[in-house]
Amino acid sequence: TYSPTTKEDKLRDEVRTRDFNWIKSDIKPEERAYRNGHRAALILITGEPGSGKGPLARTLEHNLFQNNFQSYLLDRRNVNLGVSADLGDATVEDESARRLGEVAKLFLDAGHVVISTSNAFHKEDQEDLRLLANPYQVIEIQVASQPTGEPDITMSLDQAQDAKTASTKIQDFLKEKKILMGHNYSI
């Protein structure tokens, strides 16, 4: 019999089982997108501590909300205080990231643009979150003096400090990627 050998294989199997057994809504993602004026997406704002990720995330959520988009700031700390409160210590980082991904998936299924920020999003966490969020798009915005990896948007520390301008840049990118479409588009 098959038995997953790596953490990635185990998570992939869990997601496959979850998706196969998931009780799906009768409302299709396209219908939600039409109603909301946007497609569901997970936006990960990554970077070093003190780089302005939190204020940027809150500004982005607020601006999207003000423009009648369904947005939600899903902070990892809140998930840790709620559904991950039973984990207790920092040795369960993988499980904390998995639970964040599962909560994000619920919001994505409801059609939201989910914004999350953490100092602890490692490459492995991001890959797990992409797997958990599938089929929804995951956008990485990296705030750093020296970017690493291949984020969708890179912002310098100075750019991120001007949260309003940075939020506009992100929204322009989301429009370009056809995530934000406005309330007058047709399917």
Residues of each region from the PLM?
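Glycine-rich phosphate-binding loop of ATP-dependent small-molecule kinases
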Residues: 1-187
